[in-house]
Amino acid sequence: LDGFDGLLRESDYVLTTLPTAPETRGLFDAAKFNLMRGDAVLINVGRAPVVAEEDLYNALRNKQIGGAFIDVWYGYPTPEDPERKPSRYPIWELDNVIMTPHCSSRSDASRERRWMTVPRNLDRLAKGEPLENVAFSGAA
C-alpha cells in the first residue's frame, strides 16, 4: 500500500471495493480517518468490515470527514431478526450519510428500476427534495 496515506490526505472521494480478508479488515480506521480531508467522502461498495464500524461512526458524527455513501452494512435483517439495524451505531441518523442496500442487479426488472430511480433521486437531491425509496429515515 505504498502511497496510500498520501492519497487519503489528497482525495476528495475515497472508494473502497475491497473484500473482507485478514489484510483488509479494519483497514479504514481512526488513524486513516485522521489522514483524510475534512470534506472527503468515503464510499464503501465492497464489504463493511473493511471499515472499522465505531471509528466510521465517530468520524462522521464529529464531522471529521465530510460524509459517507455506504452500500454495505454491518448487519442485515434476517427472518429471526427482521428489525436488525445496519450498524450497532445509529449511522443512519447522521445527516452526512447516504445508505443503500447491497442487493442490486437481482433481476432485469430491478436493474431497469435502478436506471430510472437513481437519476431521479440525484435530481431530487440536487433540488433539496426528499429522496424516493428511503429504507431508514432518521429515527429508524
Predicted regions and their residues:
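Adenosine-nucleotide cofactor-binding segment
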Residues: 1-27
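Rossmann-fold NAD(P) dinucleotide-binding segment
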Residues: 23-42
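Structural alpha-helical scaffold elements that stabilize or flank donor/cofactor-binding regions
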Residues: 6-10, 32, 90-91
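Alpha-helical segments flanking ligand/cofactor-binding loops in enzyme cores
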Residues: 5, 34, 54-58
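Rossmann-like dinucleotide-binding domain for NAD(H)/NADP(H)
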Residues: 39, 46-140
